[in-house]
């Protein structure tokens, strides 16, 4: 089975169509106002509408959301997965799953072997895990910073929950990232952009081809 791909930070229909036609397995929209990739719920609904009957999952990315924020988005947008990319505790992850009846993918910041061990508190609690690089000091967002971590930290690790690799992936490094980490799914945002917050159709196509080719 080939490695799955999530294209995150989509803001318009055209980029969504490119990702779907190129073979993306997940599309992601960011609901975090400080991000250059933030979209309003109505806009996200238009992005996800491009999926139609295709076998592609809709992922909503949130950072320490309140139930009110989640409700506001879910009133307008059908999601298949809620991605929590902030400092949510294991009990908050359980609460979100329970309150909204949707699978939760918990993003976990990795820099050292200790960070990998700390992530185990979320294994089985979250439906899926997403390993991303720890953001640099002073960063204005906890992800989407085009920073990679040492993929070998994940080599031969074993998890009950399915997991994805993220953080600084791009057309040049994604094959090595898959080989070293042993991941079965990758997530990219910055690496398929022409400039911050602006996706490049050409890079989306090249990235997916590099993963699946
Ligand atoms: O993309 C963002 O702006 C963002 C904001 C807040 C939290 C996470 C964010 N992005 C996610 O971070 C990882 C890695 O992204 P990158 O490829 O290094 O840019 C990925 O899951 C993004 O969706």
Question: Each predicted region: which residue ranges?
Answer:
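Conserved N-terminal beta1-alpha1 strand-loop-helix module at the mouth
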Residues: 1-185, 190-213
């Amino acid at each position: 089975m080939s490695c799955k791909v999530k294209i995150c930070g989509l803001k318009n229909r055209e980029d969504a169509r490119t990702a779907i036609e190129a073979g993306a397995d997940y599309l992601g929209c960011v609901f975090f106002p400080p991000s250059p990739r933030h979209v309003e719920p109505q806009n996200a609904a238009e992005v996800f509408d491009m999926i139609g009957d295709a076998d592609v999952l809709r992922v909503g990315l949130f950072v320490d959301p309140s139930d009110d924020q989640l409700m506001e988005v879910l009133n307008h947008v059908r999601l298949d997965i809620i991605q929590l990319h902030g400092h949510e505790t294991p009990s908050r992850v359980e609460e979100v799953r329970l309150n909204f009846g949707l699978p939760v993918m918990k993003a976990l910041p990795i820099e050292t072997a200790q960070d990998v061990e700390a992530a185990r508190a979320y294994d089985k609690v979250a439906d899926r895990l997403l390993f991303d690089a720890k953001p640099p000091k002073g960063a204005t967002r906890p992800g989407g910073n085009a920073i990679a971590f040492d993929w070998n930290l994940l080599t031969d690790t074993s998890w009950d929950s399915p997991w994805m690799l993220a953080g600084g992936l791009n057309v040049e490094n994604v094959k090595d990232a898959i080989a070293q980490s042993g991941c079965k799914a990758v997530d990219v945002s910055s690496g398929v952009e022409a400039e911050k917050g602006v996706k490049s159709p050409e890079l989306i196509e090249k990235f997916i081809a590099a993963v699946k080719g």
